């Protein structure tokens, strides 16, 4: 009996050490994942002020003869095309929900999609005549808040505006990034895995975001003929390169240097 008892004790000790090691590994993995999400949050906050945003006057020059809803449709179409391109490039990598060390491809997708959607949100606020008050830093914080909450900013309610990149905004951003990383890709059919899935999911999510923001902005929309003269938006010192389409061209007016549909004369920057 003694040898058997000793063997049982050794087996129990081994199981205990294995369980302890597993728990420790899970904790270390969780800590690394949280650190990766925190880094992504800071990265998005860092690039947000560099996103080029067209003001209402520029958009009206670029889309002559179109009304607010028609221009908004154009902006959404361009953003959807841009995020689909980002998703198609790294669709397979997005199948890793929360890896111990986040793949560079997945981090690039999240930040790329965020930049395109932040630009969309800012320009939709311009189109609907509800530019958030303040200088670039305050407006950028407001757009980040709108993106993380997937809602429009009500400029008549100061409580909906974040005047600085505080802890509350960072926490909401982390939650939003986590949701994007953990979205329902793992539950899709195996034969759908890959670039097509990344594009389809990003396309769907950007459309959903745009619909929610536009619904909010329509409630507080200011008609163009009732708008006060607004100053031109400040241009970022180091503009972030974004995909160019007829709807997302970052210029100050209509282009006249050739095709605008991605043809051979269109050599603008492309997202990876």
Segments and roles (model prediction):
Residues 1-86, 120-272:
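Terminal, membrane-proximal amphipathic helices
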Residues 70-119:
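Long, highly hydrophobic alpha-helical transmembrane signal-anchor segments
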């Amino acid at each position: 009996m003694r040898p058997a008892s000793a063997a049982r004790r050794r087996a129990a000790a081994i199981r205990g050490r294995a369980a302890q090691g597993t728990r420790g590994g899970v904790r270390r993995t969780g800590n690394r994942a949280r650190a990766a999400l925190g880094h992504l949050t800071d990265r998005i906050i860092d690039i947000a002020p560099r996103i080029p945003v067209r003001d209402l006057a520029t958009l009206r020059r670029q889309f002559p003869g179109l009304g607010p809803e028609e221009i908004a449709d154009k902006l959404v179409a361009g953003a959807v095309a841009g995020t689909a391109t980002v998703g198609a490039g790294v669709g397979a990598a997005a199948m890793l929900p929360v890896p111990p060390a986040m793949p560079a491809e997945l981090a690039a997708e999240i930040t790329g999609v965020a930049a395109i959607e932040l630009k969309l949100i800012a320009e939709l606020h311009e189109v609907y005549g509800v530019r958030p008050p303040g200088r670039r830093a305050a407006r950028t914080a407001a757009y980040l808040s709108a993106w993380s909450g997937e809602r429009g900013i009500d400029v008549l309610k100061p409580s909906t505006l974040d005047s600085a990149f505080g802890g509350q905004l960072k926490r909401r951003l982390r939650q939003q990034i986590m949701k994007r990383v953990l979205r329902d890709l793992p539950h899709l059919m195996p034969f759908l895995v890959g670039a097509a899935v990344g594009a389809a999911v990003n396309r769907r999510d950007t459309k959903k975001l745009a619909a929610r923001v536009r619904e909010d902005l329509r409630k507080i929309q200011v008609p163009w003929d009732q708008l006060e003269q607004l100053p031109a938006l400040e241009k970022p010192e180091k503009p972030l390169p974004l995909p160019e389409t007829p709807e997302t061209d970052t210029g100050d007016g209509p282009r006249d240097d050739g095709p605008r549909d991605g043809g051979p004369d269109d050599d603008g920057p492309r997202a990876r």
